């Protein structure tokens, strides 16, 4: 016996691809022996369903169940044609068998009986596709949950499309004429175009209506529903336009500073149309009440919040008592401005950041708007830390910049309240200090470029953008290198060297005072030597 005969006798035919395989290439863990290639191609989780489908096909078309362990060399040529046809057979007939025989994947059963056994010689490589217009589909089939009329050829698809798996090719099976029917085209023209019976058209229309009534979202939104939403949205726009006119009349009685600020806020916010155009409906527009800062509309999670912090006046979400404020459109924020006192001015791009310094803060404490009071406190935060240096600040530190507020400009405002205590009533400064003690300090702004000049806390000379000493505890403590060098020499570089301001500023979150590291001291003192050499030369 030759080696080829011995090898052929040891081979086992795969149940699916019908090809002789070596024993190590076969898998016996399923109901039928299959090769590793078929298992990898179909997937181990679906191979049982494919085996069951192939078993039904073999029974229906007269294949013999019991195959010999390996084909003899003489019969290999005669069986080559059938073995080459078999993979196509199992691939193309699975969808039809899934409809007729049913399966474990949720395929719908019908009363169609399997076709009678047929001969093998009927199958060739040029076999036409099975008929799709018979009664095996029943009265209608469902696409995305909507019952559609029958009579349209379905392209050849893999068997997994019988399941409810999302597939982009699925939506392309509905003809354009049927899409016109679903979008509200008169039924007479649709019947003339498609050539369907009146019963199927009525069934399709009734199914679409029932899907809308049951709350299910149809595959394509009807034009009437879309027009209704657009009309509702247009009505809401007209109402908002009337509100704009009424508010414009109310602004006439306000002071000039308040009018300028309200106008700037109206233009700085993004328009309502672009902000809410993509919403599902105008029901997402939230209202604001003076007595209830947190809306009770139940749509707090309707719009996504931005995760990055934003300066005031830019549309960021403000928290009050630990609770996030709901998003408000530009028109609603104007309501807040009109209800608040003149001291609530969110600094826009055309107003000086300190335009609200000259007005007393008592109005914000009367309780008209908690958000107004909170933003006012945040604007004045940090003033108590620099109050001791207020009488030393040079006049060049007054801020008249027209740029919008940034974290760096907020820190610059904290450098000194300047002559504000002289302009405020007697209770103004104490109330500010009491509200500011609970606010955390912001980060140093040495790395943030801005147009406002930095000044040394001690000598009030202008600082460079990157070459100065920043106290990590008090943001308003900024010192030039000569002042820092002099302070280190006065305190003695051998021991602990604290803040050049002369105070022991505690670190954030602890009582330990901040002190220079030895490397920092060496760097500052080394700069003194270099400067002296440069001056000598």
From Swiss-Prot:
Mind telling me which PANTHER family this protein's record contains? Answer: INTERFERON REGULATORY FACTOR 2-BINDING PROTEIN 2, MYELIN TRANSCRIPTION FACTOR 1-RELATED
- Which GO cellular component terms, listed alphabetically, does the Swiss-Prot or TrEMBL entry include? nucleus
Principal localization?
nucleus
Zn finger intervals (RING-type): 456-503
Instruction: Tell me one GO molecular function of this protein.
Output: transcription corepressor activity
Where in the cell does this protein reside? Nucleus
Residue ranges annotated as compositionally biased, kind Polar residues, are 162-176, 334-366, 389-400, 423-432
Q: Which UniProt keywords apply?
A: Metal-binding, Nucleus, Repressor, Transcription, Transcription regulation, Zinc, Zinc-finger
Q: List where Basic and acidic residues composition bias occurs.
A: 224-254, 270-281
Recorded source organism is Xenopus laevis
Q: Name one Pfam family in it.
A: zf-C3HC4_IRF-2BP1_2
What are the boundaries of the region Disordered? 60-179, 209-254, 268-366, 382-446
Report if keyword Repeat is assigned.
no
Q: Where is this region: Cys-rich?
A: 456-503
* Identification of the protein by name: Interferon regulatory factor 2-binding protein 2
CDD domains attached to this UniProt entry: vRING-HC_IRF2BP2 (cd16716)
Q: What does this protein do?
A: Acts as a transcriptional repressor.
**GO BP: any one term:** regulation of transcription by RNA polymerase II
Family to which the UniProt record says this protein belongs: Belongs to the IRF2BP family.
Write down the InterPro entries for this protein, in alphabetical order.
I2BP1/2_C3HC4-RING_sf, Interferon_reg_fac2-bd1_2_Znf
Q: Where is the composition biased (Low complexity)?
A: 73-84
- From what superkingdom does this record's organism come? Eukaryota
